[in-house]
Amino acid sequence: MIPIKIRRHFRHSRARPLIALVTAVTASAALVSPSPSTSATVTEVSLAPAAQTAPSAQPDATSTAAGTAPTKAQMIDGETTLSVDSLAPEIITSGQDLTISGTIANGTGEPLEGLSLTVQMEDSTEMTVTGLESWLAEEQDSAMRRIYQGDLGESITPGEIKTFSVTIPASDLPLGDEEQWGPRGLEVTVSRGRAGLDQDRTLLVWDTGAKAGRSHVTTLIPVTASTSDLTLLTTGAEPPTDADLADLRTRIASLLELAGDGVVLAVDPALLEALGVTRETVAAATPSPSPSPSPSATSEEADDEAAPTPTSPPEPTETSSASPSPTGPAGSAGPSATASPSDSPSDRRPNQALTRALVEAIAAGDVVALPWTDADVAALTHLGETDLLADAYRRTEESQTVAAGAPTSLAWMAGDLDSATLDALPDSAHTVVTAPGDLPVEEDLTYTPSQVTSVGSRTVLTPDANLSDALGGTLVTDESSTDLSGLDATQLLRAETAVMTRQAPALSRSVVIALKRSDAAGVDAKTLAERLKALRESSWTSPQGLGALTAEAAAQQEEGTKVRRADVPDWVVGDEEVSAGELAAARATRDYLSSVTSILPDPQAAIGTASEIVERTASAVWRSDPPGRASMAESARERGTAVTGRLTAVPSRTINLIASEANLPVRIT
């Protein structure tokens, strides 16, 4: 039965950025019951100002100022918008009630009165990822069942945003056939009379506990510089101050804290060096090897178990927290050193905190070192820049990131993989990550196969394009690309892995997800951690590390079970690759900076790390912003220009030359 089917394409409701009201709005908050029109006898709906922080409603007017928590529904001039902001639970089991909460924004010039809410749920589970995404993007419809309809009971004044909450009993949910476990679409519509004003869609995941082979999930996270980070480090008249770098250090440290089961952190050693990770900071953060492998050492090891990171080794030389987060546990001072003045909640050595985060990450999970400045291996190969590429690998091998324990075993392609690039990789790079969607399967399969294969002696990971987009907070279909809300991104990750698991429940497969370099800087680490947790803790998934993927690739070869994929092409040049002209311009800037600073006792104090302009121009992250790459080389000259502008010749006394030649003393300040 489908009593109501409302179809509206309100594209703005899918992209739901968090906004705060600048002007104060007032509203009366009340708890209202649904109208008798709903068959759900114990269903509840509440409507209250979005600014309220407690579930209890106040009858008096309250205001929503700019300093309050941001609301979710987007205020659009002349329109009414609705946003589903939370589900409780997000993964539902049989017999559970469902609570849907959200916000409604009145961007019109008149009060909204006589409003009603309608909630519909899909009758069956989506069977394909493409169908799931098209439905969520409101590009296609499906059979829906109305599970709630009721009046809101209050008006919403112009410029006001109000929250709503609807609780639907388990008996009203179309969740009967346990074989239909997995994602179900939810659609919430706000109407006035017969006119639908706006609607929003999200996903609920039904977990019946059905037996299925878990999907083994591996997620790759780039801990690399963004284009804006490289611009900060390289351009401008003055090098960035430590205050300028504070946010960048915090962001990188927060990414390192994501280390754990099923997560692979791919780190750029050049970025960590630019942020102050040195031999000294690594030595200070590395656990002391003093507990020797003798029976008497067991008690010391037991004491060291109190370190903040459960899977990391003890931290004997530092007692403060690893990042600018709340202070660490008391009494964790190590046996080999006394606390330094910086070991305080206001750690005055941010480079030490960042180094500690690196060391703890290496102990907690898979951390690999990328070539210096995350060099675009394919682009440099296509340009014949063998020396620059070799230098990138050499500098990584000599870096403190590798000294801390990160191997150089992984190469992460920024574009399509080709044979020329494979041949250019060093022997140490025995695992290759392709761009999402590269090397597609060329067999007719009814399920998504493991996203790991092999080419020659190398393990090749082929990340899932849909899941990789969702991890970055984007819904990409054949027709559109839309930013996802936090709820939708998390639910889409759960939903798509559930669909993939259901396709072949008797067959456990490996799922590889890669966060795009361009997305890494734009996703809050806390939000990213929640998405990783959703992938790790679903009953149909389990985390998996690099070692298991390598073993699976070897087993495929030995057993002849490797799925046939497209052959690796000989040569593929991407449109966004760095050009020979851009590298030439970068080299000209480097030479200019070198000539300007050659007379200075400490060039780095004057220009910072701008001398890395060539290496940074070759970074893979610039594929997302080729124009920015082209302008960086010219902008980097500002450092040299600032130096020459401060040079003056100091006046001296007259010198009479009697000989035909002489050495003249010149002092430059």
What does each model-identified segment do?
Residues 29-73, 77, 110, 411, ...:
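C-terminal region of N-terminal signal peptides and the immediate post-cleavage residues
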Residues 67-82, 637-646:
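Proline/serine/threonine-rich low-complexity linkers at boundaries of modular beta-sandwich domains
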Residues 243-246, 257, 263, 394-406, ...:
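Catalytic grooves of carbohydrate-active enzymes
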Residues 1-41:
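Secretory targeting and sorting signals
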Residues 126-153, 648:
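Short beta-strand and strand-turn-strand segments in soluble, beta-rich domains
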Residues 197-359:
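Active-site beta->alpha N-cap acidic-glycine motif
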Residues 103-109, 667-669:
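Asparagine-centered strand-capping/turn motif at beta-strand->loop junctions
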Residues 172-186:
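Short glycine/proline/serine/threonine-rich loop/turn segments at secondary-structure transition edges
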